[in-house]
Amino acid sequence: MSDRYYRPTFVNVNLDAISSNFKHIEKLHPNKTVIAVIKANGYGLGSVNIAKHLMTSGTDFFAVATLDEAIELRMHGIKAKILVLGVVDPKHIRQASRHRLALTAPDAKWVEDASRYIEAEDKPVWLHIKVDSGMGRIGVQTKQAYDMVVDKVAAVEQFIFEGVFTHFSSADEDNALTERAYDKFLGIINDNKPQYIHCQNSAATLRYDCSECNAVRLGISLYGYYPSEFIRAVSNVKLQPAVQLVSTACFIKHIKSGDTVSYGATYTAQSDEVVATFPIGYADGLPRAMQGYNINLEGTEVPIIGRVCMDQMMARVPDDTLLGAQCIIIDNNADSNQSLERVAQQLGTITYEVLTSLSRRLPKRYYIGDDIEVYNELMK
């Protein structure tokens, strides 16, 4: 049974919000295929369950980062199209064939190497050629190099040239880099356009039309978050945050003035205080740097005191706090002091890092209307 959990700490995932965000993007780009990006375990929320939910509403194209992530989806019955965005070792090409996956072709050499491992009886492998328009990670940088990849793909019977794509480095900022990258991308692919042409990540999807493309890749915004405050300001799309991180007080104690809390004795009580311990720590994705950060304890903001431990954290709480009191660490209310954006800002990082750090040992509670389905990966 995967619906059991024995530690009162969990992630609430609003599947209705995820569906709403997806539909908003479909309306914004009505003539484009929306590719749902569910890499990094669905941005920490459970890729398999996110995929299953989206498929019920018609989504038929997903993207992940690694071959392992793609195979995991297949093993759990996800039959939709899956594109692996990262570079797969060519010697594993037959795994992609066996599981009917689409792979990224980063250059001509990769195609050559992969062709040596494919067998005549193997099923087709769909390939999306990656163009480096300025990100500097993977992909071809010139039209000549792109055309060479196209020719190499055409020479292998089992390879299907299905798509071409790029990734903008600065679409979440107000600058001209993205326009230049888009022009470079179009110039490179000019004479060889496959079925799918995609260049828009979440930021570009919310900001640009990119009319020469016919697909968009929806990542962080699928889950209700803007890639940057700039994009939030310029976008007309109202995203709905889907994530809430919750824990419950498992121990209450009274301490005296001068008592210390947690490793290194970094917190010293200035008066007699009440301290609640919560069963969540940095092994769950709660950074140690959150010492001093306020959580919401049943409507009252209280500070995390002392260093966050691997499995537990402590907070200074009101005198009348009882065992079982519930705290919100990350809120699904965009205006809350515990919103994902404000948590990330306090930590000096981005929403992506906080979200994808959520551990697989955190049970997920998936909401559709009033219905709740619990999934605990440790009990599957």
UniProtKB/Swiss-Prot annotation:
Listed GO MF terms: alanine racemase activity; pyridoxal phosphate binding
GO biological process: D-alanine biosynthetic process; peptidoglycan biosynthetic process
EC number(s) given by UniProt: 5.1.1.1
Catalytic activity: L-alanine = D-alanine
Gene Ontology cellular-component annotations: cytosol
Gene3D superfamilies the UniProt entry points to: Alanine racemase (3.20.20.10), Lyase, Ornithine Decarboxylase, Chain A, domain 1 (2.40.37.10)
Pfam families for the chain: Ala_racemase_C, Ala_racemase_N
Cofactor(s) required, per the database record: pyridoxal 5'-phosphate
Binding site for substrate: R137, M310
Modified sites of kind N6-(pyridoxal phosphate)lysine: K39
Keywords: Isomerase, Pyridoxal phosphate
List of catalytic residues: K39 (proton acceptor), Y263 (proton acceptor)
SMART domains for this protein: Ala_racemase_C (SM01005)
Stretches assigned to coiled coil: none
Pathway: Amino-acid biosynthesis; D-alanine biosynthesis; D-alanine from L-alanine: step 1/1
Entry annotated with the keyword Isomerase: yes
Domain of life: Bacteria
Functional summary from the UniProt entry: Catalyzes the interconversion of L-alanine and D-alanine. May also act on other amino acids.
Family assignment from sequence similarity: Belongs to the alanine racemase family.
Name by which UniProt lists this protein: Alanine racemase
Gene that this polypeptide is encoded by: alr
